[in-house]
């Protein structure tokens, strides 16, 4: 049974929205009044430590819900200034500013440059220029800091970010692999290999602090890309068939020679996503063990998000065998199998998957978010549906789900009344 992913949020749509809010940037790395940006520093950061302040500025940008091109330009401007100053001995002697370059410095520099591409998605030349400069910063950083884990993770992220903006954006349904269009799976495989390399470096050095929201962004980018490939061409088809039902998505078949065919026709990328998300969660737990009290809240939020996504992934995979079990149990009792599964096989597979989903969904619960409790209850109901009618297992599972729904319903003034009534009537 092929593993599934919850749908991505659509990086291209997000970039398009950001572009509308951005200011015009004339050339790579150029800025305007961007040095006015400031950020509140932690007490442990020295006021004259330029690189430490840059890290704080990047952290603020990454966590901001109102990201802008101006903020990125401010970061790049500061990177430019710091790098110039390291080559100017006279300027360094004129003040007491502390500058100590690191792999993290070059990683921030490169990530900021590549992020600018999302504000210029309609100008392929600019997009290519931003990525070229980003990779140049990675290369410079590698020469100075060859064992930097920060650079390895940053390079993987930049590689995967480039794919939708430079390669997928230029494709049509009738595109074919050739001199002008390459097989996109090759670029994707390279970015995944780079991520695995970064993981090995981090684990070998016991640097589990790298398992944070910023680096999880790579797995989110992969999720978005796979979602984009799954739905490739549908917007065009939907535009041609304006009378189609809203819930009916047109099915787009890609030719074997299409640059996206190898990705769309293979389950290995979904499997890789899940395996790497599970590994990320394991390493995140080690990060949490050694994190400071200040870092714990954000890491706890990230852990719940990972568990939620993994839980949803197993729920989606359970849909097919669960439907086979239901069909063979109640609607096609004379049939021996469906979709290659017997009733008993479908029952066992779906139960195993629902139980795995619950393992993660329970960890994704937030005492302040009743919806996360309901996610657990609904998964329990789905599991209960795969047990024999009126069996002890079914009754116990439904009872536990009911208790959770009652609690959530009371906490939300009846928001989940319909779900609760359906369970009790069933």
UniProtKB/Swiss-Prot annotation:
Locations listed in the record: Nucleus
Keyword Transcription regulation: yes
Polar residues: bias regions: 25-35
BP GO annotations: positive regulation of SREBP signaling pathway; regulation of translation
GO cellular component, as recorded: nucleus
Principal cellular location given in the protein's record: nucleus
InterPro entries registered for this protein in UniProt: Nro1/ETT1
Domain of life assignment: Eukaryota
Location of the region described as Disordered in the Swiss-Prot/TrEMBL record: 1-35
Entry keyword set: Nucleus, Transcription, Transcription regulation, Translation regulation
Stretches assigned to coiled coil: none
Family the UniProt entry places it in: Belongs to the ETT1 family.
Function (record text): Required for correct translation termination and probably involved in regulation of hypoxic gene expression.
Stated name of the protein: Enhancer of translation termination 1
GN (gene name): ETT1
């Amino acid at each position: 049974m092929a593993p599934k992913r919850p749908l991505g949020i659509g990086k291209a749509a997000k970039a398009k929205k950001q572009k509308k809010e951005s200011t015009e940037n004339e050339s790579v790395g150029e800025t305007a009044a961007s040095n006015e940006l400031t950020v509140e520093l932690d007490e442990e950061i020295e006021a004259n430590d330029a690189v430490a302040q840059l890290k704080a500025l990047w952290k603020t940008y990454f966590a901001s819900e109102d990201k802008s091109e101006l903020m990125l330009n401010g970061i790049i401007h500061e990177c430019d200034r710091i790098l110039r100053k390291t080559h100017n001995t006279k300027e360094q002697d004129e003040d007491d500013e502390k500058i100590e370059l690191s792999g993290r410095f070059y990683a921030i520099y490169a990530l900021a440059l590549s992020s600018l591409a999302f504000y210029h998605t309609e100008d392929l030349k600019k997009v290519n220029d931003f990525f070229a400069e980003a990779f140049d910063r990675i290369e410079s950083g590698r020469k100075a800091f060859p064992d930097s884990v920060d650079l390895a993770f940053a390079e993987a992220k930049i590689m995967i970010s480039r794919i939708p903006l430079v390669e997928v954006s230029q494709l049509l349904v009738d595109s074919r692999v050739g001199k002008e269009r390459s097989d996109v799976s090759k670029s994707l495989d390279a970015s995944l290999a780079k991520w695995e390399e970064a993981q090995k470096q981090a684990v070998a050095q016991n640097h589990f602090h790298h398992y944070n929201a910023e680096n999880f962004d790579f797995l989110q980018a992969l999720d978005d890309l796979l979602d984009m490939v799954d739905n490739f061409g549908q917007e065009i088809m939907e535009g041609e068939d304006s009378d189609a039902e809203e819930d009916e998505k047109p099915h787009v078949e890609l030719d074997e020679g299409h640059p996206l065919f190898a990705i769309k026709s293979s389950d290995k990328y979904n499997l890789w996503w899940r395996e790497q998300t599970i590994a990320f969660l394991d390493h995140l737990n080690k990060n949490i063990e050694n994190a400071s009290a200040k870092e714990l809240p954000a890491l706890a939020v990230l852990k719940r998000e990972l568990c939620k996504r993994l839980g949803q992934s197993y729920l989606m995979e359970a849909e097919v065998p669960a439907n086979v079990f239901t069909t063979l149990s109640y609607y096609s009792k004379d049939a021996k199998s469906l979709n290659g599964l017997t009733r008993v096989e479908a029952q066992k597979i779906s139960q195993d998957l629902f139980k795995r989903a619950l393992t993660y969904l329970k960890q994704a619960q937030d005492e302040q978010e009743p919806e996360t409790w309901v996610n657990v209850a609904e998964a329990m109901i789905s599991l209960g549906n795969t047990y024999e009618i009126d069996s002890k297992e079914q009754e116990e599972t439904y009872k536990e789900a009911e208790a959770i729904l009652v609690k959530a319903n009371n906490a939300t003034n009846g928001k989940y009344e319909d779900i609760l009534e359906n369970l009790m009537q069933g």
